[in-house]
UniProtKB/Swiss-Prot annotation:
Region: Involved in Mg(2+) ion dislocation from EF-Tu, residue numbers: 80-83
Gene transcribed to yield this protein: tsf
Keyword Transferase part of the UniProt annotation: no
Similarity remark: Belongs to the EF-Ts family.
Compartment(s): Cytoplasm
NCBIfam families hit by this protein: tsf (TIGR00116)
Biological role: Associates with the EF-Tu.GDP complex and induces the exchange of GDP to GTP. It remains bound to the aminoacyl-tRNA.EF-Tu.GTP complex up to the GTP hydrolysis stage on the ribosome.
UniProt xrefs under InterPro entries: EF-Ts_dimer_sf, Transl_elong_EFTs/EF1B, Transl_elong_EFTs/EF1B_dimer, Transl_elong_Ts_CS, UBA-like_sf
A Pfam family recorded for this sequence: EF_TS
Gene Ontology MF: a single term: translation elongation factor activity
One term under GO cellular component: cytoplasm
Protein keywords: Cytoplasm, Elongation factor, Protein biosynthesis
Protein name in UniProt: Elongation factor Ts
Amino acid sequence: MSEITAAMVKELREKTGAGMMDCKKALAETAGDMEAAIDWLRAKGIAKADKKSGRTAAEGLIGVSSQGTKAVVVEVNSETDFVARNDAFQELVRGIAKVAVSTDGTVDAVAAATYPASGKSVSDTIKDAIATIGENMNLRRSVALSVEDGVVATYIHNAVSDGLGKLGVLVALKSTGDKEALNAIGRQVAMHIAATAPLAIRPEEVDAAVAERERNVFIEQSRASGKPDNIIEKMVDGRMRKFFEEVALLSQAFVINPDLTVAAAIKEAEKAVGAPIEVAGMARLLLGEGVEKEETDFAAEVAAAVKG
């Protein structure tokens, strides 16, 4: 069995919110497999699927920019929030987002593109900014969406400046209808995506591995009821239907009008748009998502628990 380290216990606790001893036991029961340990805790009712660590190392900004029927969202990290509030840094992120629209939107393509204000690549411009501002920074993520007919609506939650904030969303809507009305529903859907973080647009598009993992957790939880297998199967099927409704955009209750699903709200909007609307893509970037910062005092606490 793999050695259970303090760092592993710390990571599991941050991901699940479970107690240190529960995390240590979960890792021991699963031979140190982090994902399996998360599922073990969930099956025992100790952790929830959507528990996220609030400890993120990355500061910086999310930037959005659009041009015609294309838009991009980028994440540029800095070490401190102080730098993120710096006018020069904000202008840099805004400029990178504008450059990104003319590329295919991948990080490599954006990094290699020319930054007009410096005449250098975006990558080299960031290096110059590091020397000037005195803090490490990097282009971490970039996503572009485009449609032939329609709009790509953008949304920045709690914007700190024009097109800049901590959470950015794109949603691509295919339609030959009125662009102004299309942008209006697009912005509302983008706001909804910011609030709910759907995993996919449609239930059938949810990653099969994610769905299978949920089903296995539900099976273990249902077995604890002691009911026959045929009843357990029905219970699991019902919970899976609810799971898909909760994580797929179009089947979610629309945050702006919970009486409607997102699909129904879009259908309603077709009256004003004057043509059918199809959700062709979406992207949601939350600053620092998936990056953890060092918590030295807490690490010492975990180390004591592991030794115990």
